[in-house]
């Protein structure tokens, strides 16, 4: 899909047009825009990324909480990480991004580690249909959280 998108942009770039891609969150973290920029830059096109507000910072603000303190590490992990159990075992706060598709497995891993009560989920932060669960132990297991689901796991 990324190659096809880059191919669709090439005629516009070859014609001397500027092309922009809007992005939810920041383009430097798990963003399609970053993949496209890499493909186009490898073909010799000039690319530039503009910073945005990371989705997990927006989620923390929505929850009215800080992500971490000066003495606590912060781990940012894709929800589909194959080593999720190992990531959850690390000291510090965790951000599980784009967790919606893998939510049943993520919830099970959090439950096994006794972390549901210390975990919060926000889906579609700042968008229509926003869902906020400050305590994942009350999240309805049958509910679909959607693609833009972010989970914050805090330390004790």
Residue ranges of each PLM-predicted region?
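Class I S-adenosyl-L-methionine
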Residues: 1-46, 133, 139-141, 146-150, ...
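Structural motif corresponding to alpha-helix initiation and N-cap regions
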Residues: 3-6, 78-81, 103
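Short, glycine/serine-rich, charged loops/turns that create anion-binding
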Residues: 26-28, 54, 101, 126
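A contiguous loop/helix-start segment that scaffolds small-molecule binding in enzyme catalytic cores
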Residues: 19, 88-156
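Short beta-strand/turn micro-motifs composed of small residues
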Residues: 23, 78, 123
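Structural motif
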Residues: 22-24, 50, 97
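Short, structurally constrained coil/turn elements
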Residues: 15, 70, 113-115
């Amino acid at each position: 899909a990324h190659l096809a998108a880059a191919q669709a942009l090439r005629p516009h770039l070859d014609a001397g047009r500027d092309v922009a891609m809007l992005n939810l969150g920041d383009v430097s973290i798990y963003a399609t825009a970053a993949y496209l920029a890499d493909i186009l830059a490898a073909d010799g096109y000039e690319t530039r990324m503009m910073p945005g507000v990371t989705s997990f910072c927006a989620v923390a603000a929505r929850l009215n909480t800080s992500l971490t303190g000066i003495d606590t590490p912060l781990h940012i992990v894709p929800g589909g990480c194959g080593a999720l159990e190992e990531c959850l075992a690390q000291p510090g706060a965790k951000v599980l991004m784009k967790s919606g598709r893998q939510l049943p497995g993520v919830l099970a891993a959090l439950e096994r580690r006794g972390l549901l009560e210390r975990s919060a989920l926000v889906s579609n932060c700042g968008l229509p249909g926003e869902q906020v669960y400050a305590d994942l132990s009350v999240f309805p297991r049958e509910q679909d959280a959607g693609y833009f689901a972010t989970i914050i796991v805090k330390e004790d």
